[in-house]
Structure formats: C-alpha cells, structure tokens
Amino acid sequence: MDDIQKQILELARKANVPDPVHYVDYAVEELAKDKINEIIRTCDCCEECCHGTKSIVGGNPHGSILMIGEYVLEEQNGSEAVIPFEGTPEGQMIHSVLNSLHVNEEQLIWMNVVNCYTHKVVNGKSLKRAPKTSEQETCQLYIDYAINSFKPLYIVLLGNIAMNVFKKGVVKQERGKWFYIRDSIKAMPTYSPTYIRQMEEIGDEFAEDYRKEFQEDLSKVFKEAQEEYPESDILLA
C-alpha cells in the first residue's frame, strides 16, 4: 500500500467508514480517473498532434469492464476533450448494441489507446491519419496506469490498434477469443466500430456479418462477466 492509500485509509478509519479497506480502493479509483485526465489534457509529448482534441477516460472508474478504443474520431475533432465514441455514428452503434444486450453501462470504463486527434497538414488542411507506432507507445502508459488503478475484471479491445497493445495479430483472426492480460484479466478483441462503419459505407458484402460478430463478441463478454460476478449487476435483465 503506497503513502496515498495509507493516508486515505487513516482518514477512513477516523471517520468510522464501514469497510475502510474497500473505501480506499473506491477513493483511489476516483483520484486515478481525475489524475489520468488531468495529465492527458496537458500532455505535449507528440508535437504534431498534442494541441488539439484530447480523448479522456470516461464512464465509471469503479466499473467492472474496461472498453478500449483506438483514437479520437474525425467527428470529435474541434472539441477540447471527448470520451471515446462520444457524439459519433460509431457511438450510436455501440450504445445500440449495448442496449440490445441489456448492459448496465454504469459498469463500463472507456478510454482510447491514442489520446490525440492524429492528423497531418496538407496544403493548409488538417487531414485524419492513422496513429504512428511512437504515438501508440507514448500513450500506452495511460492504459497501464488505468489497469493498475481501476483493476477491471474484463477488458474489451475494440480494433487492431487496441488489441496490438497487448497481443500482436489481426482482429479478424483473433476476435471472439479470450486471452489474459497480466495473467489474471480476461480480454477479448473484436472489431472497431469505425471499421464496421467504413465497411457499411462502401457496401462491403460482409459488413452485416461484421456487425453481427461484433454483437456476438460483446454478448459473450457480458454474459460471462454476469455469470462470474452476479453481484456486479453487469446485465440489467
């Protein structure tokens, strides 16, 4: 237990808080979310992109499931700070799926691998581009800190970039398959909502299959989580 946790525990005991040890965990999770977001907002590690829109941690820091996306989306550019998928067609899609599965979204934590709007300037115009490996590696420390602080029971990896932080491969081949992060946290990769949207927009013949498989993968995660941890109320029905 570090110094901050010891200080919180001492305050909790003085206040006669029921179950002070769990109170420490609760307080640390709240502080961790605020601290991560404070650092993200002021981060200037990547000169090319650090002065634009930032993706911060969203959802409930006490939640059971960490949902990791890829990067700030084009529709989100221009805001000071955004939560992953907030205000986008991808967000509408994923929340529709979660609603159909009766998921209690109070049990979810949201963050991205890359916390900036990655772009390049061409003829004075800002154009979206894929994150560089160096940008992904720089931002990974936030994910490591979040896992240490929030202690999620499960992690969902939305897309290739999210999966490759922990396991090298291609989502099409790895989706729907469990693997372990840090030997104890079950993780599952699935398609990025952005990829599904792109396939639908170009009329890809397998786009409908991708969406169905995406829903199947999420259903698998949440059903197992509910069975293993019924007290968490991960599913509402």
Feature-to-residue mapping (PLM):
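A polyanion-binding, active-site-adjacent surface
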Residues: D2-A237
